[in-house]
Amino acid sequence: VKRLGPADAGEVLTLQRAAYVTEARAHGDLDLPPLLETLDETRAALASVLSWGIREAGRLVASVRLTVTGEVGVIGRLVVAPDRQGAGLGGGLLRFAESAAPAEVTVFRLFTGANSVGPLHLYAKHGYRETHRTPENNHELVHLEKARVHPPGRVR
């Protein structure tokens, strides 16, 4: 797992678009924000958040973003290349982002579409619980939250 930055924006955007097509189809909405994001927006986002990726043979196959505001870490754009989904990369990257978050983060939040069966299962498996839902175009977003668990003996 390596840090990503603005120089990785082209690869991140390509990966993101490939990964979100499935979600767009599941929700009948091709206007999902990750599919509409421009290269400049991706570059700006990577300059302002913490982001990590996994490469295999030089190819970016998974990435995630973490936005920290006070005690809250918001996980976003957790994506895995379609041909590598189901291999544990998403869960591994999620755990990595949680462990790499600054010490002041006490809670993690994220959201996904209500029809995103795979991601909802992944997040539940990793301890995330639904807090509420909000309307988004012709579907709902499911908002989830998880309290940070500090390893025993770790100073907070």
Per-region residue spans from a language model:
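A short, internal acetyl-CoA/4′-phosphopantetheine-binding micro-motif in the GNAT/acyltransferase core
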Residues: G53, L78-Q85, T112-A114
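Conserved active-site alpha-helix within GNAT-family acetyltransferase domains
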Residues: G91-R95, A114-H132, N137-E140
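Conserved beta-strand in the GNAT
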Residues: G53, R59-V68, V74-V79
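Conserved GNAT acetyl-CoA-binding A-motif
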Residues: A100-T112
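Glycine-rich acyl-CoA binding loop
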Residues: I75-G76, G86-L94
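A short beta-loop-alpha structural element at the N-terminal edge
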Residues: V1-T14
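A short helix-loop-beta-strand connector motif used in the catalytic cores of GNAT acetyltransferases and
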Residues: L39-G53, V74
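Conserved GNAT-fold acetyl-CoA-binding loop/helix
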Residues: T14-T42
